[in-house]
């Protein structure tokens, strides 16, 4: 798999913004960022892709797979796509420029 296709987009939600500042509040110098990643990506590929894109080595990667919800449109059932989300921990308060994604 090409490393440029591993990271799809950053996830910017209230919960992910709270994760970025939780390390400062607990007295640690760690920062957590959340990304939507390719469904076939594993933790090693995610680390390599982030190192290539941002020149920062992550200390920890946690991955979760989300199943698409069943929805109805005009009484016809359809399913939203499945996706994978990665919560990546960086040490020493690393700041990432999301314009590169």
UniProtKB/Swiss-Prot annotation:
GO terms for cellular component: ribonucleoprotein complex; ribosome. Keywords: Ribonucleoprotein, Ribosomal protein, RNA-binding, rRNA-binding. InterPro entries: Nucleotide-bd_a/b_plait_sf, Ribosomal_uL23-like, Ribosomal_uL23/eL15/eS24_sf. The keyword Ribonucleoprotein applies. The keyword Nucleus does not apply. Belongs to the universal ribosomal protein uL23 family. One of the early assembly proteins it binds 23S rRNA. One of the proteins that surrounds the polypeptide exit tunnel on the outside of the ribosome. Forms the main docking site for trigger factor binding to the ribosome. This is Large ribosomal subunit protein uL23.
């Amino acid at each position: 798999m090409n490393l440029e296709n591993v990271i799809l987009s950053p996830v910017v939600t209230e919960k992910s913004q709270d994760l970025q500042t939780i390390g400062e509040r607990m007295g640690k110098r760690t920062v957590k960022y959340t990304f939507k990643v390719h469904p076939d990506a594993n933790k090693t590929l995610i680390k390599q892709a982030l190192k290539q894109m941002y020149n920062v080595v992550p200390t920890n990667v946690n991955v979760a797979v989300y199943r698409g919800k069943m929805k109805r449109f005009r009484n016809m059932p359809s399913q939203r796509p499945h996706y994978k989300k990665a919560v990546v921990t960086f040490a020493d308060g690393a700041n990432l420029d999301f314009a590169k994604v």
